[in-house]
Regions:
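C-terminal beta-rich recognition modules with glycine/proline-rich loops and embedded aromatic residues
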Residues: 365, 434-443, 448, 452-536, ...
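Solvent-exposed beta-strand/loop surfaces of large extracellular or lumenal domains
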Residues: 555-580, 600-606
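Hydrophobic, small-residue-rich alpha-helical packing segments that form membrane-like cores
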Residues: 241-355
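Helix-terminus loop motifs that line ligand-binding clefts
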Residues: 116-201, 376-387
Length: 715
């Protein structure tokens, strides 16, 4: 049945934004079961995508990911294939793909059981780590005059910094300076480019910089993932040491060569090099990725107390007051900003809080998440138009105005999922987090890899007759090629959360999970996607509480049956159904029934379809829409996406807005009918003479939003 969900713009009180965290401690309430303890099983789209990703990861030549480092540090590059895409020798973002490659190797290793595959993945990580340490050690230069090793602060004194250039000729010269970079610098880009950001040099691949600290973050993240996920002590220890030394280089540079001053105008703030207020507020050039996240994580991993304190201090150096301070007050500072430049900064704020930072960091993350959910999302869970956050509540205006599929950058989905997972740790009883995680995972992330050969999306097309722009066959090709290499080997990372004596089932996936603290192995048996799942103890027994997510879309027929007895006589969608602490044994069978309910996910903004569907006008509010209607004798409409449970159902074969009309019966409750499926894919349905498939299955053009009739009327 179709149920109507009207997402009209609403005013949200500041107090709501300040609640979210269920305790005052920096420690999370729950943690996800480690990636190495959960396996997605069976034959389904999830395992097919995962296996395709692993085959691709193993097919890439590790030497291609080392070329730029060897070149930058004056080492022999013979035998190394030339890198490609954004890692090619003529780009200033080189190294970003190498960082994603290390993360993908580590994630695949943690989620893999096959000994031969694990050995192959491990050998590549060993090669990467050994080579990167060799490069880094070339910066360990003792200066007799200074009586110490050269440090980051010594590189490019201010007079020299003011004269530095960003041309390719200068770039090649700076590559010869590796002995002057300062102890610990590791990057495929010369240190000059981190320094040039202190001079507020703009984004320009020809004459200035791209995003040097973004690249540093990708490398730190890859090394930290190896250190965290790999059980080979020699490799993980070396990876951590490389990351620690680079993190301390960042601390040293920003501690002594930068400052923070928000007073005055932009011109006066830029009169002196190194004002972080301006550095991190620059478009692209000031993009730092998750530097704050990685440095905060490092601060919790290293053994030396002084190093830990410095790394956390360095994390705070990446605060962006222009972006953070309004969010901390509950004000929307999102619109008009580059989406994937800023989502990772918010992830960093939350990790800073977890590492011991102030409560404001938690509030920044929570407020940002709430704003995005209420004001900027598409039905798929993605955000953005041409990589930007546009004005709030204007998704349809942006979608319709876009002439190409420049919507919903895949990196944004990757990072919003990460932020959601991290927030869920602090308030795991709030089902909104895993409802959203399910939405973006099932609709965008799973569908962002071509099902029969490895290629992943950059933008993820949403709109009228929209086709996913397939490409990105390696993590070097683009930012989304990098996150795409990681996405499909970690579907299970947020399936289960645990505390001392409670397990939260956040996702219904065919899986096996080991909860070592309780000495039990849980088995979840279901199809994917699932309308019914059975959870059993495969090994062990124990006393604990189990909480099962009741999805927001489970408005009819939801039930929980323990050993055949129904427990859910009452339930609330978007909540957790709790089975209080009891002794669980291998004889128990827990069945979750959650029939998919069709509903309309309405877009928040009104649009007017003009004659012959050749143009659209967008009204900012109901009054303006009414005036527009009266002047043109037209009715404003609210577009909507047809949902079946958590799945966006995309319409096949619609080419224009005249065809993109979905009529609901007078009672508003028609049901999808199973349709003949010539492609042999499950989940093909018909409604109102149109054919719909789950969007994750789409590999040709489909339409996501339709003109819903029997809905909005202005009176």
């Amino acid at each position: 049945m179709i149920s109507k969900r009207l997402l009209a713009p609403v005013i949200i009180l500041l107090g709501i934004f300040s609640e979210g965290c269920s305790h005052d401690s920096h420690r999370p309430v729950a943690e996800p079961l480690p990636l190495s303890k959960v396996r997605v099983v069976g034959e389904n789209r999830l395992t097919s995508n995962r296996d395709l990703d692993i085959r691709a990861i193993l097919s890439w030549d590790v030497r291609k990911f080392l070329y730029n480092y060897l070149d930058t540090y004056g080492l022999d590059t013979s035998g190394c294939p030339l890198p490609e895409g954004w890692d090619s020798v003529d780009t200033k973002l080189k190294g970003h793909g190498s960082g994603h490659y290390m993360s993908a190797l580590a994630l695949a290793y943690a989620g893999c059981d096959d000994p031969a595959l694990k050995d192959s993945l491990l050998s590549r990580m060993r090669t990467m780590v050994d080579c990167l340490r060799e490069c880094q050690e070339r910066t360990f230069v003792y200066d007799e005059t200074l009586g110490r090793y050269r440090e980051a602060r010594d590189y490019a004194p201010e007079a020299e910094l003011r004269e530095m250039k960003g041309t390719w000729e200068a770039f090649d010269e700076y590559k010869k300076d590796y002995s002057e970079y300062g102890y610990g610098y590791l990057n495929a880009i010369p240190a000059a480019h981190c320094a040039l950001v202190e001079m507020y040099r703009p984004y320009n691949n020809s004459d200035w910089v791209w995003a040097p600290y973004y690249v540093v973050h990708k490398q730190l993240a890859g090394l930290i993932d190896i250190a965290s996920l790999v059980d080979d002590k020699a490799i993980s220890k070396k990876a951590l040491k490389i990351a620690e030394d680079m993190g301390l280089w960042v601390w040293n540079r920003l501690k002594y060569r930068t400052f923070l001053d928000s007073s005055g105008t932009s011109e006066t703030r830029r009169s002196t090099p190194g004002n972080r207020y301006e550095m991190w507020n620059m478009y692209i050039a000031g993009e730092v990725g998750g530097m704050e996240e990685s440095l905060s994580r490092l601060s919790m991993m290293v053994e030396d107390r002084t190093s830990s304190e410095r790394l956390l201090e360095a994390a705070g150096f990446f605060d962006s007051p222009a972006f953070f301070e309004p969010l901390a007050r509950g004000e929307d500072s999102i619109h008009g900003r580059h989406a994937n430049q800023h989502i990772p900064m918010v992830i960093g704020a939350l990790m800073n809080y977890r590492a011991g930072g102030s409560r404001k960091y938690h509030d920044i993350a929570l407020n940002f998440w709430n704003f995005v959910q209420d004001r900027y999302l598409y039905a798929t869970g993605g955000v953005g138009d041409s990589e930007m956050f546009r004005e709030p509540y204007t998704q349809m205006a942006s979608m319709i105005a876009s002439k190409t599929p420049e919507m919903n950058e895949t990196c944004c989905a990757y990072n919003l999922a990460k932020l959601t997972k991290d927030l869920n740790c602090f308030n795991p009883n709030d089902a909104r987090y895993m409802d959203y995680y399910e939405r973006v995972l099932y609709n965008q992330i799973v569908g962002s890899i071509y099902p029969s050969e490895y290629k992943v999306t950059y933008q993820y097309a949403v709109g009228l007759d929209a086709s996913k722009p397939w490409g990105n066959r390696t993590p070097q090709e683009s930012c989304c090629g990098g996150t795409g290499a990681e996405n499909h080997v970690k579907y299970q990372e947020a399936a289960y959360f645990v505390s001392k004596d409670t397990v939260w089932v956040g996702l219904y996936l065919p899986s096996e999970s080991r909860w070592d603290r309780r000495g039990v192995t849980l088995s979840q048996e279901c199809e994917w996607p699932a309308e019914r799942s059975v959870i059993r103890l495969k090994k062990g027994s124990g006393r604990f509480t189990m909480k099962l997510r009741v999805p927001y879309w489970a408005t009819e027929g939801f039930d929980v049956r323990l050993n055949g007895k129904s427990l859910a006589s009452e339930y609330a969608p978007c909540s957790y159904f709790e089975i209080p602490r009891r002794r669980w044994t291998r004889s128990d069978s827990l069945e979750i029934i959650m029939p998919y309910v069709e509903h309309i996910d309405y877009a928040p903004d009104l649009v007017v379809i003009l004659s012959e569907a050749k143009d659209l006008c967008e009204a900012k509010d109901l009054c303006e829409a009414k005036d527009l209607c009266e002047a043109k004798d037209l009715l404003p409409e609210r577009l909507g996406a047809l949902m079946r449970g958590p799945l966006v159902m995309a319409a096949v074969g619609i080419k224009n807005w005249d065809e993109a009309v979905l009529h609901l019966d007078s009672d508003g409750h028609p049901a999808l009918q199973a349709a003949p499926d010539s492609a042999g894919s499950p989940g093909c349905f018909s409604l109102d003479g149109k054919t719909f498939i789950p969007d994750y299955q789409a590999d040709t053009s489909v339409t996501h939003y339709l003109r819903i009739r029997d809905t909005l009327r202005i009176r």
